[in-house]
A protein has these predicted regions:
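N-terminal export and membrane-targeting signals
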Residues: 1-10
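C-terminal motif of bacterial Sec signal peptides marking the signal peptidase cleavage site
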Residues: 15-18
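Acidic, Gly/Ser/Thr-rich repeat motifs that build Ca2+-stabilized beta-propeller blades
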Residues: 20-189, 240-247, 288-319, 335-337, ...
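Blade-edge beta-strand/turn elements of extracellular beta-propeller
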Residues: 45-57, 89-103, 142-162, 198-229, ...
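Short, solvent-exposed loop/turn segments at secondary-structure boundaries
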Residues: 191-194
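Short, solvent-exposed mixed-charge patches
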Residues: 397-399
């Protein structure tokens, strides 16, 4: 059994039908620091930091992560297609299992998104969106959990190429109300440059699956192209869209996304200086990053979850005119102006303390939430995988 109880008060937990290895995630006392055997056994840097709290443990390849305004979170598992609701201080509860998911390599149940979480405030399940791999493709689904019965699933967008690797998979509703979808090249680099393919793109669609009417090509869902495998995206207070992208063997990237922009893959990896392509604003050697999730923190910096790099990278953003942090908020997602922001020197946080980091999001109170990803690749600790909460006051000065 893979469940590991680390809460100060033991809670009775029933085994969930269909859980991998009869495993059930368990809650931890979020008021405690990140003590235990996991981080210290694996750490090659400073010891566990008390600014990080372990909130839940025992997840199996967690991927999707959505914070809700009531303080709870949704966590999806890639292999089992199970979605849990996590209330800090309690054991995660199984919300639903998404049917029709066919895990394959890096594919499975990937990103989750909620258009308006006000429907969750009464404690009842509400619809959410999911990016999932099936037997034939990757697709975006609208899932209504129901009351314990089979969930109602509606296909929003299908036909996204799938493969064992490079499936993209992050989805998020932007400040403009449209759904943004990241796709990988599905191990076919040429498809990233094909405007008629959904592979290797960032897509922008309505909640019903239609192309956003003011896309670069109004009849196409494509917002940007030339991507290898984007797995993170978020907006700053001015509505600028930032995305993290896996490189191949040389350089990983953070890009400032411009509508209609071509980011160069497979012709370019990292900065290329080619006039027809947009260079990344940040790049790292692949062994230092392999970036998955990305979030704009309450301090205005980008936070990038690194898998191979086993770190959380902090990238400062400064408004070029005022010299102040960009911060978080709302804006017009397609109104990007690359010259209005200055990107600072990346800072590596929590190196080696928690292993591979898959997802990072900013919560309603400015806290950061991080999912580890050690149960697929890596060196899992006994309580992996974990949901961690970072103290906002420590974001700018972590070890």
């Amino acid at each position: 059994m893979r469940g590991h109880l680390v809460a100060t008060v033991a809670l009775g937990v029933a085994l969930l039908a269909g859980c991998s290895e009869d495993r059930v995630p368990t809650g931890a006392d979020p008021s405690n620091g990140s003590t235990g055997t996991g981080p210290s056994d694996r750490s090659t840097g400073p010891g566990p930091d008390e600014s990080v709290a372990t909130v839940a443990t025992g997840f199996e390849v967690p991927w999707g992560l959505v914070p809700l305004d009531d303080g709870s979170l949704l966590v999806g598992e890639r292999e089992t297609a199970q979605v849990f609701r996590v209330v800090p201080g309690s054991d995660p509860s199984l919300l639903t299992t998404v049917p029709g998911v066919a895990p394959d390599g890096e594919g499975g149940l990937l990103g989750l998104a909620v258009p308006d979480d006000s429907a969750w405030h009464d404690g009842e399940p509400a619809p959410f969106f999911a990016y999932a791999t099936t037997d034939t493709d990757n697709r975006v689904l609208r899932v209504e959990p129901g009351d314990g019965s089979e969930p109602a699933v509606e296909v929003v967008l299908d036909g996204i190429p799938k493969a064992g690797n490079h499936n993209g998979g992050r989805i998020a509703f932007g400040p403009d109300g449209y759904l943004y979808v990241t796709t990988g090249d599905a191990s076919d680099g040429a498809s990233a440059q094909d405007p008629d393919s959904l592979a290797g793109k960032i897509l922008r669609i309505t909640a019903e699956g239609a192309p956003a009417p003011d896309n670069p090509d109004p009849g196409s869902p494509v917002l940007s192209l030339g991507h290898r495998n984007v797995q993170g995206l978020d907006w700053d207070s001015s509505g600028r869209l930032w995305a993290s992208e896996f490189g191949q063997n040389a350089l990983d990237e953070v890009n400032l996304i411009q509508p209609g922009g071509n980011y160069g893959w497979p012709q370019v990896e990292g900065p290329g200086g080619e006039p027809e392509f947009i260079d990344p604003v940040v790049s790292w050697p692949t062994q230092d990053a392999s970036p998955s999730g990305l979030a704009v923190g309450a301090d205005g910096a980008l936070y990038v979850a690194a898998l191979r790099g086993e770190s959380l990278w902090r990238v400062p953003l400064t408004d070029a005119d005022t010299g102040t942090d960009a911060g978080t908020g709302t804006g017009t997602a397609t109104g990007t102006d690359p010259g209005s922001v200055t990107v600072g020197e990346p800072e590596r946080l929590y190196e080696g303390e928690f292993g591979r980091q898959r997802s990072v999001v900013t919560g309603p109170d400015g806290e950061l939430w991080v999912l580890t990803s050690n149960t697929f690749r890596g060196d899992p600790a006994p309580d992996d995988d974990r949901l961690l909460r970072l103290d906002p006051a420590a974001q700018a000065g972590s070890p």
